């Protein structure tokens, strides 16, 4: 049912000396997934890797790729504690979405985990930027492995 869907997960803070490699690997892997028939890409909409991946999907859509951007967001006020620049970019990216899903109306201690579960349960592929296993990203990748998703770590 979700064989044409991939999701993104990654850390909010990425080392400056790895960003260029991550970006190049991410661009290549998105193209590889599109070539394999992936048409829908789910982003959790967080600061950091999610924004980078989402921006690439928007750029590829603008270049004529027949793909969809889906946001699976933890709650409606995810950006409440972000700075104005982050909020503006977030709003711009949300405006580019083909679909926006809120897994919870309001923030709760479990809404991020539910968002991550939603992304994994609705995907066949996962592109990650995993540096630390003990993290929300690590938890999402472990769940993706357990569910049998094809996982590509663009940090490697």
Regions flagged by a language model, labelled:
Residues 1-156:
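Acidic/glycine-enriched connector segments
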């Amino acid at each position: 049912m979700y064989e044409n869907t991939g999701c993104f997960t990654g850390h909010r803070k990425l080392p400056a000396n790895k960003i260029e490699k991550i970006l190049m690997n991410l661009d290549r892997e998105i193209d590889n997934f599109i070539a394999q028939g992936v048409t829908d890409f789910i982003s959790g909409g967080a600061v950091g890797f999610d924004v980078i991946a989402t921006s690439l999907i928007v750029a590829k859509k603008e270049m004529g790729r027949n793909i969809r951007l889906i946001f699976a967001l933890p709650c409606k006020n995810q950006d409440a504690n972000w700075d104005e620049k982050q909020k503006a970019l977030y709003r711009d990216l949300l405006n580019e979405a083909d679909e926006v899903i809120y897994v919870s109306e309001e923030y709760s201690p479990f809404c991020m985990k539910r968002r991550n579960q939603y992304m994994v349960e609705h995907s066949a592929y996962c592109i990650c930027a995993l540096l630390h296993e003990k993290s929300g990203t690590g938890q999402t990748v472990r769940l993706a492995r357990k569910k049998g998703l094809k996982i590509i770590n663009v940090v490697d």
